[in-house]
């Protein structure tokens, strides 16, 4: 099924960023976090509450919607790990 619509306020990039704790302590993940939240906002704007038909229908799949809703936290965690690793190796040279 189609995931619950986060609401007009819930799809806002700033709300999404706050929920994910973007840039809080970890500035490295901020650009990734912002990009994710913006993409998520655009997705919901295009697809609406129940996956609009029409121009956006190709991307308006429940699988994508669920992925967007679940990806946030994992994405930020991964970015932080990757950045930490890069910094670690960069420091060795």
UniProtKB/Swiss-Prot annotation:
Q: Could you tell me what this protein is called?
A: Parbolysin P1
For this record, the Gene Ontology CC terms, alphabetical, are: extracellular region
GO molecular-function terms, A-Z: toxin activity
Q: Which organism is it from?
A: Parborlasia corrugatus (Antarctic nemertean worm)
Q: Which GO terms describe its biological process?
A: killing of cells of another organism
Q: Which family does it belong to?
A: Belongs to the worm cytolysin family.
Q: Tissue-wise, where is it found?
A: Localized within the skin and proboscis and are most readily isolated from body mucus secretions.
UniProt keyword annotation of Manganese present: no
The protein's job, in short, is:
Cytolysin that shows hemolytic activity (on bovine erythrocytes, HC(50)=5.75 mg/ml). This hemolytic activity is completely inhibited by small unilamelar vesicles composed of PC/PG, PC/PI and PC/PS in 1:1 molar ratios (with at least 100 mg/ml concentration). The recombinant protein does not show hemolytic activity, suggesting that it is not properly folded or that it requires a free N-terminal end for its activity.
SS bonds (residue pairs): 16-37, 22-33, 47-60
Which locations, inside or outside the cell, does it occupy?
A: Secreted
Name the lineage.
Answer: Eukaryota, Metazoa, Spiralia, Lophotrochozoa, Nemertea
- The main location is secreted
This protein's UniProt keywords: Cytolysis, Disulfide bond, Hemolysis, Secreted, Toxin
Reply yes or no: does the keyword Lipid metabolism apply.
no
């Amino acid at each position: 099924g189609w995931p619950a619509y986060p609401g007009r306020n819930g799809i806002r990039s700033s709300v999404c960023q706050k929920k994910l704790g973007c840039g809080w302590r970890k500035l490295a993940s901020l650009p990734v976090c912002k990009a994710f939240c913006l993409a998520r906002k655009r997705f919901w704007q295009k697809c609406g509450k129940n996956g609009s038909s029409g121009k956006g229908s190709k991307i308006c799949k429940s699988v994508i919607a669920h992925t967007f809703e679940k990806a946030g936290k994992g994405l930020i965690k991964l970015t932080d790990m990757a950045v930490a690793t890069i910094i670690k190796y960069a420091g060795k040279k």
